[in-house]
Amino acid sequence: MAMQPGADATQSGAGDPIDEPEALRRLQLDDDPSAQYYAAWWLGRQRSQHPQTVILLRKALQQRRPRQLGDDVEENAVARNAARALGKLGPIAAPAIPDLLETLNDDDHGLREAAARSLGQLNAKAAVPLLVARLASGPAVAGAREEGTPRLKEPCDALLEALGDIGVVEDQVLQVVHLFLDHERPVVRSSACRALLQLTGESQWGERMVALLHHDQLQVRRAALMDLGATGWYPALDAISNTLAENSLKLIALRGLAEQADNPAPDEAVLDAMDALL
């Protein structure tokens, strides 16, 4: 299982204080992947704007290291966390977009997933052709289960969500997303609906995600909550509030509604719903 830093972003696993200079120093410790892993996560979590942050994360993104017995980190863990961190940094990370685009073709499934999500967060329009190409074979190939593992051949949910986040409305984009509306996995269907709601604004896609809030699997309900929150689709307010899931996740989804771009002043009903969960 991958080492996951705790919720406290100011302390390392050993309990010593960590700040931006220390995180930058640790990211350069090529012989200590656990320190690099934590440092990359910390810099992303804190949305570091230091001039060296993107430079060092781009270097870390190129690091490849298989998981070894006794390690506390997953395969290519430093590169994966570097990819995730870059997506959180905003415009300062623009120079890393070519690196993330290249990473979309990496053999590492988890690394492709992290790169796709970050390209979506960075609104990298240059990524659209590659994202479409990765999904073009549809559920029968890209969306098929990879032999010997529970994962799909492509990280379809991440690729679909990136297309929605980037927001390029073209026929080829809409067509490839439509391919996954009836995927056997509800989480993938939710990602496709999320993307189409973002791209078209059509309420039918929001309604399909709301229906998934009643799914018997908690994992599916969680995914639909996060997808609805990401779209900021206001009609889902009551359904989100009443979903059988953790209040913490419902609060995240409701915050997405409160922060939607076309509603600069948070709606009182959303704030009341959030207060009721606290």
Residue positions per predicted region:
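N-terminal "cap/leader" segments of large eukaryotic alpha-helical scaffolds
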Residues: M1-W41
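Amphipathic alpha-helical scaffolding segments comprising HEAT/armadillo-like alpha-solenoid repeats
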Residues: A14-L27, S48-L69, P91-N105, A124-E146, ...
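Short inter-helical turns and helix N-cap capping residues of alpha-solenoid HEAT/ARM repeat scaffolds
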Residues: D31-D32, R64-R65, E74-E75, D107-D108, ...
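Non-membrane alpha-helical segments in proteins
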Residues: S34-R45, K59, N76-A85, A114-R117
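Residue-level detector of extended alpha-helical repeat arrays and alpha-solenoid scaffolds
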Residues: Q36, E75, A79, R112, ...
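Conserved hydrophobic register position within alpha-solenoid helical repeats
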Residues: A39, A82, A115, C156-L159, ...
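Long, ordered, amphipathic alpha-helical scaffolds
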Residues: H183-P186, S190-L197, D216-L278
